[in-house]
Amino acid sequence: MASAAVESFVTKQLDLLELERDAEVEERRSWQENISLKELQSRGVCLLKLQVSSQRTGLYGRLLVTFEPRRYGSAAALPSNSFTSGDIVGLYDAANEGSQLATGILTRVTQKSVTVAFDESHDFQLSLDRENSYRLLKLANDVTYRRLKKALIALKKYHSGPASSLIEVLFGRSAPSPASEIHPLTFFNTCLDTSQKEAVLFALSQKELAIIHGPPGTGKTTTVVEIILQAVKQGLKVLCCAPSNIAVDNLVERLALCKQRILRLGHPARLLESIQQHSLDAVLARSDSAQIVADIRKDIDQVFVKNKKTQDKREKSNFRNEIKLLRKELKEREEAAMLESLTSANVVLATNTGASADGPLKLLPESYFDVVVIDECAQALEASCWIPLLKARKCILAGDHKQLPPTTVSHKAALAGLSLSLMERLAEEYGARVVRTLTVQYRMHQAIMRWASDTMYLGQLTAHSSVARHLLRDLPGVAATEETGVPLLLVDTAGCGLFELEEEDEQSKGNPGEVRLVSLHIQALVDAGVPARDIAVVSPYNLQVDLLRQSLVHRHPELEIKSVDGFQGREKEAVILSFVRSNRKGEVGFLAEDRRINVAVTRARRHVAVICDSRTVNNHAFLKTLVEYFTQHGEVRTAFEYLDDIVPENYSHENSQGSSHAATKPQGPATSTRTGSQRQEGGQEAAAPARQGRKKPAGKSLASEAPSQPSLNGGSPEGVESQDGVDHFRAMIVEFMASKKMQLEFPPSLNSHDRLRVHQIAEEHGLRHDSSGEGKRRFITVSKRAPRPRAALGPPAGTGGPAPLQPVPPTPAQTEQPPREQRGPDQPDLRTLHLERLQRVRSAQGQPASKEQQASGQQKLPEKKKKKAKGHPATDLPTEEDFEALVSAAVKADNTCGFAKCTAGVTTLGQFCQLCSRRYCLSHHLPEIHGCGERARAHARQRISREGVLYAGSGTKNGSLDPAKRAQLQRRLDKKLSELSNQRTSRRKERGT
């Protein structure tokens, strides 16, 4: 009789599974009721307008039907979809939206067709006409839930059998038995490290339970394979399971290399092509009875065709009876062949649910297996683990409960305990008595590993010497650049206005700004020689994954873009993470799952780039540790370094001639804090020695962390960044403007934040500023702008032309110009040209010299020097009134985008802003982008107040009067009409008299 603990567990699990099932059914129902078929097809869960192309009989007499798009001319291809082999689908008639004809399993999916396997029970109900149109819709998996419930009920009723002692241990009714002695082993894999060898010995010596905890990259699968091989060597029969087909196939591939007799159970459609030779189908096809089975199938196909052709009811009945007899014989012969195949295999592999009693394993005795191995146990529902556990006296669980938990649809069921895996429950209950942890990882650079080790694995992990310092630049054909020379890169979007999409009807989240940053970083890696196939882009949100695919797949077909859940167990040389969340509320939502972030970061081998808004993610403690770690041990960049047209928060034209100055406004006092977009590059062990002096103290949050301010000679005094550093750069630039020098170079010792400051200050003063060089040799050159276009029309050197004057630093009034006077670096200042022209006219009127004398540059020079002495900011220009040059400059200004730094032409495509009377390109035509945001809002408020129209199409304000006021006006009108009528009556009487 089952214990109280078992009964309580089974009752609770059945209730939670019912919640989960109801949630999944409700989700599928909402798809069908609330979403159009076209929308379902665009989401990839439905295929419309299909026709039947072929039918045949498959394994176990199943009917295989191939569907393809209905052709209208040339051959058509299927639309983009998420259908994969093994999915359960419903077949519908296109003419009848609500009627489901049958359910089946996808066996093959290509770009032009899909093949569905239907059970034999559908054969006679299905009458598929090649001329009709059909559709396929993904369905919830009823089979899985039925098997889970069946296993729980079997656990509750379990009295005596091979798993009795194991059940007592797993539910805490008895302690694990003492370990047995193991003779010294000869390992099949001679490259195992100490922790792996210890785990193998421990697993083999335990009598009921052993847990192998394998953090990312520690060779967990290698260890599990060694355990299986050693068990087979001892003469044990092993049942090896995992929650997913991919995990099982991975074990099959590894065991096949060791020449073991293995058998893979499962639907043929769900197996990788590389291991199908080890599947039950393939083994049966190679058996002695294969030809007889093939002949019986052929007979079934022939009788089935005859049944379709005949119209006689008696003949149809005879054909059906014949098919039933043939299928019975087919089943008997297949079962005999299956039993022979099962008993000849040393290792049988299947998914947890594939090991159920209603599958091929029902042919074996109850105590056939000696040990059950469950890989990736931490990702499996505990109920699914009990399907194989009831078949053996000992179990070995392997996985990592610090990574993703089992996937569930019902949030309520997950919180109530459905997401608690068997491995996590037992590890917390028994601890080191049953757990062995692998400690040497063979995947990640030590800088990538250390964060995960410290935050998730108690600092137990160490990097193997072969991977401890490997970088992208060490790959063959990859150049050494800033991107390929760092293992950790943080691109901070804080303060850049790259907010997430706010779609009320979207459950998922997206961020187009981060998509652009990802694209630019990938291009930098590819340009450096990193193959796109070695790069992965990972995001926690499916909507962001879709946006990334739309933007990147056509340029980089080999690039892999997946969600975090879809990438667990995988690895790439470079991984780019898009965290998506960027909002003023500081909500992180889905990112709050610590284990999901652990999985995302630990997929990378040599380089991981995190793109996020530090101001948002720092609201979550765990994410804050990640940002702080990248800040201290990696390179930090702001999104401003990637995107030229970023619109920072609080953007305004009022205080500068460019966008950079407004972007640098901190949220707090300028002397003590700065925004997250202005982070300093952090030092790292694998970076250049110059960066080592810029490491920041540990334990401080990113928001309050103070970067070091390096001096121009390469020093890096510690302390909080103050206004003095900015003032130092500003003083240098002002001194340069007052000097006769035309160019000023800043040394390469500046970090990225200092370079950003220099760019901003140079832009404020209207100077040119360019960054040159790569890596440690990157420096900034600030230069004075070339003379105005009119200077080119003056006389050549040596002909008495005017000598060029040095630029004069602009006054505060000049730096605070209104928005309409914003201009790009190559656009002439029309206001200055106009003032110079007026000055020349006045000068000509006050000087009685001849026109020839006025045209002489040498006679004009003394007067200009005199005017300069009086403090007028005039610029030396030729004395001729070049009206054509003025017109040409005006035309050029009208044909160029008015946004600072933008030189795009607006002759063909451009938008005119009525607020500032300038033309802008399509990237900058919105008032909020080019600096007219406040004016646009004021204009909109005035229009709404005047017209009563909130937005286009909302209609106008009701113009009807208030009823009381209308009645009052009506009374006044009636009174006035009465008075006028009385006046006319009195006049008539007077005339009559």
UniProtKB/Swiss-Prot annotation:
Changing T221A: In HMNR1; severe reduction of ATPase activity and loss of helicase activity on RNA duplices. ATP binds at G214, P215, P216, G217, T218, G219, K220, T221, Q403, Y442, E571. Expressed in all tissues examined. Expressed in the developing and adult human brain, with highest expression in the cerebellum. Moderately expressed in fibroblasts. Zn(2+) 2 binds at C913, C916, H930, C932. The keyword Nucleotidyltransferase does not apply. One of its GO terms (cellular component) is growth cone. Its EC number is 3.6.4.12, 3.6.4.13. SUPFAM superfamilies: AN1-like Zinc finger, P-loop containing nucleoside triphosphate hydrolases, R3H domain. It comes from the Eukaryota. Its main location: nucleus. Changing R603H: In HMNR1; severe reduction of ATPase activity and loss of helicase activity on RNA duplices. Residues 651-723, 782-828, 841-879, 971-993 are annotated as: Disordered. Belongs to the DNA2/NAM7 helicase family. It is linked to Neuronopathy, distal hereditary motor, autosomal recessive 1: A form of distal hereditary motor neuronopathy, a heterogeneous group of neuromuscular disorders caused by selective degeneration of motor neurons in the anterior horn of the spinal cord, without sensory deficit in the posterior horn. The overall clinical picture consists of a classical distal muscular atrophy syndrome in the legs without clinical sensory loss. The disease starts with weakness and wasting of distal muscles of the anterior tibial and peroneal compartments of the legs. Charcot-Marie-Tooth disease, axonal, type 2S: An axonal form of Charcot-Marie-Tooth disease, a disorder of the peripheral nervous system, characterized by progressive weakness and atrophy, initially of the peroneal muscles and later of the distal muscles of the arms. Charcot-Marie-Tooth disease is classified in two main groups on the basis of electrophysiologic properties and histopathology: primary peripheral demyelinating neuropathies (designated CMT1 when they are dominantly inherited) and primary peripheral axonal neuropathies (CMT2). The R3H domain recognizes phosphorylated 5'-ends of single-stranded nucleic acids which promotes binding of nucleic acids and stimulates ATPase activity. This is DNA-binding protein SMUBP-2.
